[in-house]
């Protein structure tokens, strides 16, 4: 398990060890706790996002307030690559679930980037109307992803169409802090917001239909996620520091949804940089004005 903190380091913990006193290893951070002396390849500020590669289990991606994304080899505890194409803090980094070399990032510079780690300067850049809070790949469309914003909107993009989002809808009053796609039923989404609600949505081609909602009594809700092994379970947490587990089968609109066979994502996906993307954020920003 990888844990990011307000420090420029990543803790790696073994879930097989009960009551462990310290992590198995630490990626980056200070050299022997010396002030102002960082390990080679370390982030310089807080770690905001983490993502394990599903194909190469020793590879971890991290995003930071220092505006960089780093790829780590956990076995050697070293940084393999640093990506620095964003211009502001990066709260989101996500490996693609099928194409192991593809990364999704979202930054406070109001840009989402889909890049290939083998050629990180060539990618697809998509502008956002507000700062991002969360993002995740669309399990129903291997070329798509969802991104939530500080203005309470949820947007769905297709990297083959860079002119406009496929879907854009207001889902919360205040920031929409988290979005999760159900892996067994990819058209089922969950969102969480600082308004204290967790909401369930059924995704259509161009709009979302609300299937249910719950005030989970957690204060401002900062995260929600479906449990992959038990896709009817949804976890959420917030400022109350408590954890809420919701069995969404109790929602009338979802009756029978989990009785259907789980859908599978495509085995192979080919990503190419969009025709109007040069790989330079300054150029992309000029085109957005």
Predicted feature descriptions by range:
Residues 171-207:
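Loop/turn-rich, solvent-exposed surfaces of beta-rich toroidal or solenoidal domains
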Residues 16-18, 74-77, 117-120, 159-162, ...:
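Short loop/turn segments that connect beta-strands within beta-propeller blades
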Residues 23-42, 79-85, 93, 103-106, ...:
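Short C-terminal beta-strands that terminate individual repeats in beta-propeller domains
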Residues 1-5, 60-64, 103-107, 145-149, ...:
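Conserved beta-strand element within WD40/beta-propeller blades
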Residues 50-57, 62, 76, 93-100, ...:
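Loop/turn segments within WD40 beta-propeller blades
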Residues 175, 204-289:
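Terminal intrinsically disordered, low-complexity extensions flanking WD-repeat/beta-propeller proteins
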Residues 7-11, 45-48, 66-70, 78, ...:
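Short coil/turn segments within WD40 beta-propeller repeats
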Residues 33-52, 88-95, 125-140, 174-181, ...:
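Canonical WD40 repeat/beta-propeller blade segments in eukaryotic WD-repeat proteins
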């Amino acid at each position: 398990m990888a844990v990011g903190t307000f420090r420029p380091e990543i803790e790696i913990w073994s879930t097989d060890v009960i009551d462990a006193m310290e992590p198995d290893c630490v990626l980056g951070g200070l050299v022997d706790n010396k002030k102002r002396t960082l390990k080679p390849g370390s982030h310089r500020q807080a770690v905001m996002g983490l993502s394990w590669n599903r194909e190469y289990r020793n590879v971890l991606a991290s995003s930071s307030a220092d505006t960089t994304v780093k790829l780590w080899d956990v076995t050697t505890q070293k940084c393999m690559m640093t990506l620095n194409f964003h211009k502001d803090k990066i709260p989101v980094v996500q490996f693609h679930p099928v194409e192991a070399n593809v990364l999704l990032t979202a930054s406070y510079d109001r840009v989402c980037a889909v890049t290939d780690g083998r050629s990180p300067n060539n990618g697809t850049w998509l502008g956002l109307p507000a700062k991002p809070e969360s993002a995740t790949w669309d399990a129903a469309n291997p070329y798509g992803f969802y991104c939530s914003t500080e203005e309470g909107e949820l947007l769905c993009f297709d990297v083959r169409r860079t002119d406009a989002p496929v879907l854009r809808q207001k889902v919360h009053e205040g920031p929409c802090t988290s979005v999760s796609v159900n892996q067994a039923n990819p058209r089922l989404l969950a969102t969480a917001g600082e308004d204290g609600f967790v909401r369930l949505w059924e995704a259509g081609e161009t709009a979302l239909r609300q299937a249910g909602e719950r005030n989970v009594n957690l204060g401002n809700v900062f995260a929600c996620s479906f449990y992959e092994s038990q896709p009817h379970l949804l976890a959420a947490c917030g400022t109350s520091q408590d954890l809420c587990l919701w069995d969404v089968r109790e929602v009338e609109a979802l009756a029978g949804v989990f009785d259907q066979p789980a859908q599978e994502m495509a085995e192979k996906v080919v990503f190419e940089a969009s025709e109007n993307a040069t790989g330079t954020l300054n150029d992309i920003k000029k085109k957005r004005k």
